[in-house]
Amino acid sequence: MTRVASTSAMNLAKKLAEAGIRHPAVLHAVATTPRELFLDGALAHKAYENTALPIGQGQTISQPYIVARMTELLLQHNPQKVLEIGTGSGYQAAVLASLIPELFTIERIKALQIQARQRLKRLDLHNVAFKYGDGWQGWSNRGPFDGIMVTAAAATVPQALLEQLSEHGVLIIPVGEDTQQLLKITRIGQTFQSEIIEAVKFVPLINGDLA
């Protein structure tokens, strides 16, 4: 299907540009991704507010600014193959899938994964592979990945995700518990260069348990 920018989505993209998002492709993706599709009907009227919102199961759809910021950080490295940890509502996956050739996404809550798959199908996004599983372990038999994006905060950086980065691959991950920082970690051979981007607040990345 052809994705047409609604006035509300265009206004949101404009606000994100004013907040510092510069990549035109990211702004276009936000403007043409119907965020209301990823929310319960009772919250649809809040879809284009720049705020995180509940999606059930104790999870949230991320603030549009942070979706755009994390996507922009990835696109700086022109990734062709990306792993997303934490499919959630599917909104971040929809933005990513419109910008990169191959997306792999993992969700530990089955009900959310089913809904996200249906939503991306409605948007005619067919370059996405879904997995129900423990995101802490990544998806080793589909790696390595040029980029990995984690949409929940890990207490520490999962070693498995570092190992699944390709050479010069980039991991975008929020790390911390009470205080969280968004990190950009770049693989150079067997070493990893870490850069603090900004303070953030995410739900925790759960290690092991599936729901």
UniProtKB/Swiss-Prot annotation:
Annotated active site: S62
Catalysed reactions, as listed in the record: [protein]-L-isoaspartate + S-adenosyl-L-methionine = [protein]-L-isoaspartate alpha-methyl ester + S-adenosyl-L-homocysteine
Cellular component GO terms, alphabetical: cytoplasm
An example molecular function term from Gene Ontology annotations: protein-L-isoaspartate (D-aspartate) O-methyltransferase activity
Enzyme Commission number: 2.1.1.77
Superkingdom to which the source organism belongs: Bacteria
Location within or outside the cell: Cytoplasm
Biological process per Gene Ontology, one example term: protein repair
Keywords: Cytoplasm, Methyltransferase, S-adenosyl-L-methionine, Transferase
Name of the top EC class for this enzyme: transferase
PROSITE patterns per the UniProt record, alphabetical: PCMT (PS01279)
InterPro entries associated with the record: PCMT, SAM-dependent_MTases_sf
Protein family: Belongs to the methyltransferase superfamily. L-isoaspartyl/D-aspartyl protein methyltransferase family.
Job of this protein: Catalyzes the methyl esterification of L-isoaspartyl residues in peptides and proteins that result from spontaneous decomposition of normal L-aspartyl and L-asparaginyl residues. It plays a role in the repair and/or degradation of damaged proteins.
Name this protein carries in UniProt: Protein-L-isoaspartate O-methyltransferase
Gene: pcm
